[in-house]
Amino acid sequence: IVRRYRTVDIMEENQLYVIIVSGRDDSCRDVTRKWLEDNYIPYDELHMRKTDDDRDDRIVKKEIFDAWIKDRYNVKFVLDDRNRVVEMWRSLGLKVLQVGEGDF
């Protein structure tokens, strides 16, 4: 049984360029790619924190955004679950769809 997420279908139907910014570090890159593949989540770019970088997700994701996304793309929306990261994205003026309870 193939399970697809409606949001993923909408992104594909509208030919959106999908950039994943993960809080996982590079040591998990292969496992993360496999998980994305197994869950039928297409993407165009995958950005992850450097191995052994244990800084707060807000800092890491903001740095990735500034370095790789901000001046290159017109971001339509962000999907995230962690409350404090959702707040960071919103503080940048981005529309955020919070995908789960994120008080962790």
Question: How should these model regions be labeled?
Answer:
Residues 65, 74-104:
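Acidic, Mg2+-coordinating phosphoryl-transfer loop and its flanking beta/alpha structural elements
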Residues 17-19, 47, 77:
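A structural signal for isolated positions on well-ordered beta-strands in alpha/beta enzyme cores
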Residues 26-74:
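Substrate-recognition "cap/lid" segment bordering the active-site pocket of phosphatases
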Residues 1-19, 26-33:
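Short, acidic loop-to-helix structural element flanking the phosphoryl-transfer center
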Residues 1-4, 58-61, 82:
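Amphipathic coiled-coil/heptad-repeat helices and related helical stalk/stem segments
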Residues 12, 37, 90:
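Anion (oxyanion) recognition and catalysis
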Residues 21-24, 79-81:
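Short His-Asn-centered micro-motif
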Residues 16, 41, 94:
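Short phosphate-binding/catalytic loops that engage adenosine nucleotides
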